[in-house]
């Protein structure tokens, strides 16, 4: 069907992935329900007491490509957080999504709950998707999850608020104080463990002070793994036959065995590169300088910023959320992996004893 390797990888549901889906739901079951939780804001001078309470968003519409596991994750997360969910998946995984939703609906009905709480749109026609995106009276938020084209289409055409889950152009910066063995492990895990996912590494930034020691080893490892390298002029001497990359070619989400590399003069240049070409998803520094790590975490604008840990941990299941509905790359109303709490909002609770405003 002319599907690329990244798409095929997302579509596959083998025993291991089915077990992982089930385990994710079991973790969600054990998590605290955020709905109804109150936090005290304070008491005003006039005596009124102010709190805020967690409430569901309402009706969530997921628009996604491939990834049948999204059907299970989104259904479980939305139900646990008190939301109804409409799931509009891609045609490639439609039968699988319908089968998963049917299982969830059977369980809902057995417990005298409306099966419409988890609904899969059975027709992937784009005209129907457009109609869904215009239902401001019935849908509270749309969460698109997929390729850049889908995200842009939904953002440009929806009349319902959208939480964007944009592409994952994730970088590893190898600092001059890096442990190069750690850096190599982070690089190979982030780039080659699973390439067709949004938390895979797409960029490597290396301080010039360690480039001579590190990049020849990278060249050997990538040759063995079959990784195609695009590198700037300063780093090209370490790679035989690598493409010398143009400035405007950085920022690509390859979703395969390809990577863009830049050798930089200093820490500030690394941060500038990430600011220009990252996608606010996940960024990693490898350094033994704790203060440099903290500075990186403060300076870099991304939903997840890591020190000496693989970008592949940028995932709801790995961060203790059980599963995620996606990884938000815009700051409204959530940022990063979205779990139960991200599927709620807050309302004010104000208690008084008859106070009136002067």
Q: Where are the regions a protein language model picked out?
A:
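N-terminal Rossmann-like NAD(P)+-binding subdomain of aldehyde/semialdehyde dehydrogenases
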Residues: 1-50
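A structured beta-alpha segment of the ubiquitous adenosine-cofactor-binding alpha/beta core
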Residues: 14, 27, 45, 49-52, ...
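Substrate-binding/gating loop at the entrance of the active-site cleft, primarily
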Residues: 41-85, 90-100
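ALDH superfamily catalytic-core signature
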Residues: 66-84, 103, 110, 150-256, ...
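A glycine-rich helix N-cap at a beta->alpha junction
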Residues: 106-120
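Short, well-ordered beta-strand elements within core beta-sheets of diverse protein domains
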Residues: 205-206, 256-265, 280-285
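C-terminal core of ALDH-fold dehydrogenases
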Residues: 272-357
């Amino acid at each position: 069907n002319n599907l690329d390797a990244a798409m095929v990888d997302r579509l596959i549901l083998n025993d291991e992935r089915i077990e992982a889906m089930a385990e994710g739901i079991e973790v969600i079951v054990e998590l605290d329900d955020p709905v109804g939780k109150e936090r005290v804001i304070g008491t005003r001078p006039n005596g009124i007491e102010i709190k805020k309470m967690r409430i569901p968003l309402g009706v969530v519409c997921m628009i996604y490509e491939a990834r049948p596991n999204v059907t299970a994750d989104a259904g479980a997360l939305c139900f646990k957080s008190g939301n109804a969910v409409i799931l509009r998946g891609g045609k490639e995984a439609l039968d699988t999504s319908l089968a998963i939703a049917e299982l969830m609906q059977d369980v809902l009905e057995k417990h005298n709950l409306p099966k419409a709480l988890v609904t899969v749109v059975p027709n992937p026609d784009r005209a129907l998707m457009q109609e869904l995106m215009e239902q401001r009276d019935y849908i509270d938020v749309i969460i698109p999850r997929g390729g850049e084209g889908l995200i842009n289409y939904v953002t440009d055409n929806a009349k319902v608020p959208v939480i964007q889950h944009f592409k994952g152009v994730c970088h590893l910066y190898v600092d001059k104080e890096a442990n190069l063995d750690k850096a190599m492990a982070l690089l190979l895990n982030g780039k080659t463990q699973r390439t067709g996912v949004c938390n895979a590494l797409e960029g490597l930034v290396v301080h010039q002070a360690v480039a001579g020691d590190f990049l020849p080893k990278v060249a050997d490892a990538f040759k063995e793994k079959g990784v195609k390298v695009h590198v700037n002029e300063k780093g090209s001497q370490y790679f035989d036959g690598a493409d010398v990359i143009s400035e405007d070619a950085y920022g690509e989400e390859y979703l395969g065995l390809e990577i863009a590399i830049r050798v930089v003069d200093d820490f500030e240049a690394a941060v500038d590169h990430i600011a220009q070409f990252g996608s606010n998803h996940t960024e990693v520094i490898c350094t033994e300088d704790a203060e440099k790590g903290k500075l990186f975490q403060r300076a870099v604008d991304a939903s997840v910023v890591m020190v000496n840990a693989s970008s592949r941990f940028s995932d709801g299941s790995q961060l203790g959320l059980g599963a995620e509905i996606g990884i938000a790359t815009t700051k409204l109303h959530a940022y990063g992996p979205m779990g139960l709490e991200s599927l709620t909002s807050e309302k004010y609770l104000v208690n008084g004893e008859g106070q009136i405003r002067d």
